[in-house]
């Protein structure tokens, strides 16, 4: 049984790595895969299972931090500046990089404030199957609207052309995504596209903005719940973290490579299908009624 439970931990890490930064809602998938199927709370205990989810989320966040490590160093004026997307050598020499630490901080402020104010309320009252389904569906519609609008925008902006107002509005949408199932990346990428960024630029800024705030939030949660970690459960934490980190690296790089080509509608359609599937399990078979 121990081996089977380890495999379950790895599966949850893989799911987290695949979905945390994709616009499909990692919360929705964790409810489907864990709460409705694998039920980590049954072999880890409810408190330890909650802490396990924090740890595997950190695996995904560290993956994003690694992918954007050079950009973070540049923002902090530590690394070498790389070329700006879409600009030639002369333009690069004459025009400084525009994305800076203030952009990131401006984008983080709304979610940071609302997170401090409402995190406990959201965790207590909004983490249920019906509310997650609502978030998945409404978020999908928002993504479709953003994609439909994007075809009308000529010469969409790159991430280095973002201004502070755009950063702030995208940050507000990150706060809206605190509703479980809405998806942080789905919300912020869609808003970025509506603010006339291209899909890759909106994704880049989404991930850059998300890493510090998610590190802070997950780190704080881990400090609150570290006493729930049992020595016997450490192998689950390690394997889950490594699975989330490894799969997260692959998923993030693949997503960034493809997003300007495939855009958001395929993810929106997938979310709607996922809502239907979860609804059948929940309303038709009563699976997850206790969540």
Curated annotation (Swiss-Prot):
Gene Ontology BP terms: cell wall organization; peptidoglycan biosynthetic process; regulation of cell shape; response to antibiotic
Its membrane topology: Multi-pass membrane protein
Positions of transmembrane segments: 1-21, 48-68, 102-122, 126-146, 162-182, 203-223, 231-251, 267-287
Species of origin: Staphylococcus aureus (strain JH9)
One Gene Ontology cellular component: plasma membrane
The reaction(s) this protein catalyses: di-trans,octa-cis-undecaprenyl diphosphate + H2O = di-trans,octa-cis-undecaprenyl phosphate + phosphate + H(+)
Protein's gene: uppP
Stated role: Catalyzes the dephosphorylation of undecaprenyl diphosphate (UPP). Confers resistance to bacitracin.
The protein's name: Undecaprenyl-diphosphatase
């Amino acid at each position: 049984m121990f081996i089977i439970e380890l495999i379950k931990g790895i599966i949850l890490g893989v799911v987290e790595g695949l979905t945390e930064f994709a616009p499909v809602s990692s919360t929705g998938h964790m409810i489907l895969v864990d709460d409705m199927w694998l039920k980590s709370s049954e072999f880890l205990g409810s408190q330890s299972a909650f802490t396990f989810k924090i740890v595997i989320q950190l695996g995904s966040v560290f993956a994003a931090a690694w992918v954007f490590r050079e950009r973070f160093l540049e923002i902090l004026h530590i690394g070498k500046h790389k070329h700006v997307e879409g600009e030639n050598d002369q333009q690069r020499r004459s025009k400084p990089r525009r994305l800076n630490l203030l952009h990131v901080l401006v984008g983080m402020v709304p979610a940071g404030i609302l997170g401090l104010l409402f995190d406990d309320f959201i965790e207590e009252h909004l983490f249920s199957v019906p509310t997650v389904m609502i978030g998945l569906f409404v978020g999908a519609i928002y993504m479709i609207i953003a994609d439909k609008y994007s075809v009308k925008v000529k010469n969409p902006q790159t991430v280095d052309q973002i201004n502070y107002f755009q950063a702030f509005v995208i940050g507000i949408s990150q706060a809206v995504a605190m509703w479980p199932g809405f998806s942080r990346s789905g919300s912020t990428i869609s808003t970025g596209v509506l603010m006339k960024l291209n899909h890759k630029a909106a994704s880049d800024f989404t991930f850059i903005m998300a890493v510090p705030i998610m590190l802070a939030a997950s780190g704080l949660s881990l400090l609150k719940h570290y006493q729930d970690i049992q020595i016997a459960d450490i192998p689950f934490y390690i394997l889950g973290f490594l699975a989330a980190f490894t799969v997260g690296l692959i998923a993030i790089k693949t997503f960034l490579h493809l997003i300007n080509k495939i855009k958001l509608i395929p993810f929106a359609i997938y979310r709607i299908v996922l809502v239907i599937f979860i609804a059948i399990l929940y309303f038709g078979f009563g699976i997850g009624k206790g969540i």
